């Protein structure tokens, strides 16, 4: 006899569960965990690009400027811009004949 016929049997043209222990706290906890797992799996599949991009890059938004005077912030911005400008000068033009 299969497990299916032992647990679920036709009752009045419907399928019902003959488990008398369905109010057991372990069964209730397992059901809740199963439902939560299914919900999390569906959300993961729907939003996996956003979720893993967040994990990969984190919440990095640059160094904190809290408590730093405005003049030093401006100096830092200029240094960063100069570094970007210096990198732009490294490109080499190659002409093919």
From Swiss-Prot:
What residue spans carry the Basic and acidic residues bias annotation?
71-80
Chief site of localization:
virion
Q: Which residues lie on this side of the membrane: Virion surface?
A: 1-22
Glycosylation site residues: 20
Could you list which ranges are Intravirion topological domains? 44-97
User: Per UniProt, what is the membrane topology?
Assistant: Single-pass type III membrane protein
- Is Thylakoid one of the keywords? no
Residue positions bearing lipid (S-palmitoyl cysteine): 50
**Residue stretches spanning the membrane:** 23-43
Q: Which family does it belong to?
A: Belongs to the influenza viruses matrix protein M2 family.
Question: Function, please?
Answer: Forms a proton-selective ion channel that is necessary for the efficient release of the viral genome during virus entry. After attaching to the cell surface, the virion enters the cell by endocytosis. Acidification of the endosome triggers M2 ion channel activity.
The Swiss-Prot or TrEMBL note on domains reads: Cytoplasmic tail plays an important role in virion assembly and morphogenesis.
UniProt-recorded name of the protein: Matrix protein 2
The organism encoding this protein is Influenza A virus (strain A/USSR/90/1977 H1N1)
Organismal lineage: Viruses, Riboviria, Orthornavirae, Negarnaviricota, Polyploviricotina
């Amino acid at each position: 006899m299969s497990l299916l016929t032992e647990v679920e049997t036709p009752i009045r043209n419907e399928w019902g569960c003959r488990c008398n222990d369905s109010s057991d706290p372990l069964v209730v906890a397992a059901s809740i965990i199963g439902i939560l797992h299914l919900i999390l799996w569906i959300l993961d599949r729907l939003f996996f690009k956003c979720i893993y991009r967040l994990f990969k890059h984190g919440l990095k938004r640059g160094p904190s400027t809290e408590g730093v005077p405005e003049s030093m912030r401006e100096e830092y911005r200029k240094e960063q811009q100069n570094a970007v400008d210096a990198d732009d000068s490294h490109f080499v033009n190659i002409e093919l004949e």
